[in-house]
Amino acid sequence: MSDLNNEILYKMQTAFPLNQRPFLTLSKEFNIDEDELILRIKELKKANIIRQTSAIFDTKRLGYKSSLVAFKVKPKDIEVAVKAINAHPGVSHNYLREHEFNIWFTLAITPDSKLSLEETVNILKNQSNAQESIILPTLKMFKISVKMDTTGKVAKKEKLKKRDFKDIKLTPLDIEIIKELQKDIPLKIEPFKDIIERLNITYQELFNRAKELQEAGIMRRFATILNHRKAGFNANAMSVWEAPEERAEELGKLLASFSAVSHCYLRPTYPNWKYNLFAMVHAKTEEESDAIIEEMAKETSLTNYTKLYSTKEFKKQRIIYFSSEFKRWEEQFI
């Protein structure tokens, strides 16, 4: 892939402009014309390097309850388990990982769900013939920022910024805007034109509301998401660490400061699960990933840790917020 395409990909992951002609804005940064930029992006999309470009919303701030969940499933039951888990509209990620707890997925339920998160997990556990399950909600988030360093120029460590959010009450228009902005944008000169026409609003109204949603932390960012493997990031390791409770926050922040870490959380422990810090590491090779994790261990002085590489991706797609599919799924069990 050309250096210019790598620069474009990194920029679109970090700062996609929200204006009437975002591709024009971006093209000026790279000293190419708008049509050439759109053509390059279309080629990257066709090659399946770009997954989608859309708003990324905060599940919790929208009132949804969510958790990471792990199942221990016998090899003969994996196919059945995957079918059951993937059928839930609140499952956005589902992976096979190298561990006795071998199926790992994220699950979200709506604010008005008739079933609790635990009840939903139990239904999926029974459908999956899982032997054991653990529910690992976020107790503290240290970092969430999926940005693949396609340029090779990003520093090994980064400073984390603490953000304060203002409270807003979602209006019916906000909900309609969220429904629209969560979709992949069309690759054309005015990608937001269809939205303002459907909602019968102006560009100014759309971008003002989007800014409000960002200031409230409801919309984390508007960005391009890549297919990690297609973009050359073939090693996807979930590193898990046993940290002393009194130092968990300090050490979580230290793990999160590594640029190769996209997500870093504090989660609960159980008799059958002793690790409380989770840090997702993305690298081009397992050797590179292992070296990063070794460096993380050295800096934190943590000795009890392991890494769970994903060996198969069963599902990776955005949750469709305010979708009727959640209610439809629940109605089978109520």
Question: Which sequence ranges carry the predicted segments?
Answer:
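A compositional/biophysical signature of low hydrophobicity enriched in polar/charged and small residues
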Residues: 1-334
